[in-house]
Amino acid sequence: MTRRDTPKFTAGQLNVYTRPGDVAAVTRALRATGRRIVLVPTMGALHEGHLTLIRAAKRVTGAVVVVSIFVNPLQFAANEDLGAYPRTLDADLDALRAEGVDIAFTPTADDMYPNGMRTTVHPGPLGAELEGALRPTHFAGVLTVVLKLFNTVRPDRAYFGEKDFQQLALIRQMVTDLDLEVEIQGVPIVREPDGLAMSSRNRYLDAVQREQAGALSAALLAGMYAAGEGTAAAVDAARAVLDEVPAIEVDYLEVRDAMLGPAPEVGMGRMLVAGRLGATRLLDNIAIDIGVPSGPGRQAEFDEHELPWRN
């Protein structure tokens, strides 16, 4: 058996690998020198939300930052937009160079699934709720590819955005239940000036739809302010905003607890919304304080709430 040498890695520049074995060998060698491996998984079409994840990863002392770019076919159903999903690899690599990323891992589907997509990770009951109720195979595909990325890169830490909050919760669940030695870091949603959560799919919206899409974050904001009166009041306030924009076909609007279990009567919760504008599906969510009376000074507390779209 011929031993393969470790692929070349040059510090101070972007190193691009497509084969899982190559990136595994490089990260293993770097880890042996005491470096920490930090992973930012993406599907490409990078925007400011992704770059915020990368910048958070780069703040880890001694980190080698690995960004994966892979449009995972396993998480798309037959009727979904796999073929239309934006692929901008050259521009993405330029963005990674500008951010000082160390490694880009850009496998093909054949690289990731050389024996076909036959073994998957079952997401459990939470994977059949919210997004999973509408996309029953989605989270099995997500968790499978994330586990494969973890097994290949062996990161000490991995960064995910909170926009896909259910995905983040399920990844944390998988790490706990399967005893994976990786720390998961969630990063707050990055928003456009009008509040729309940044997403690679936003580019599908025409000018009218783009303006209408701002109702999603406005609805969440209304729900957050009403949450002191309880969950039902929060949902009613958010629904009233969405009803003003009938072009948005709402798939769900729900309040859960911070781990996406049933909403508490009092305490921190998470309001989640998903809907369609034309052929484009959009997700958003926000943390809310449920059942806490307004009272003197409470408005000031809300005014200090972290709202990235307040300019």
Swiss-Prot record:
Alphabetical keyword list: ATP-binding, Cytoplasm, Ligase, Nucleotide-binding, Pantothenate biosynthesis
Binding site for (R)-pantoate: Q75, Q167
Pathway as given in its UniProt record: Cofactor biosynthesis; (R)-pantothenate biosynthesis; (R)-pantothenate from (R)-pantoate and beta-alanine: step 1/1
Protein residues bound to beta-alanine: Q75
Enzyme class: ligase
Listed EC numbers: 6.3.2.1
Cellular localization per UniProt: Cytoplasm
Listed InterPro entries: Pantoate_ligase (IPR003721), Pantoate_ligase_C (IPR042176), Rossmann-like_a/b/a_fold (IPR014729)
Note: The reaction proceeds by a bi uni uni bi ping pong mechanism.
Listed name of the protein: Pantothenate synthetase
Organism: Mycolicibacterium vanbaalenii (strain DSM 7251 / JCM 13017 / BCRC 16820 / KCTC 9966 / NRRL B-24157 / PYR-1) (Mycobacterium vanbaalenii)
Gene transcribed to yield this protein: panC
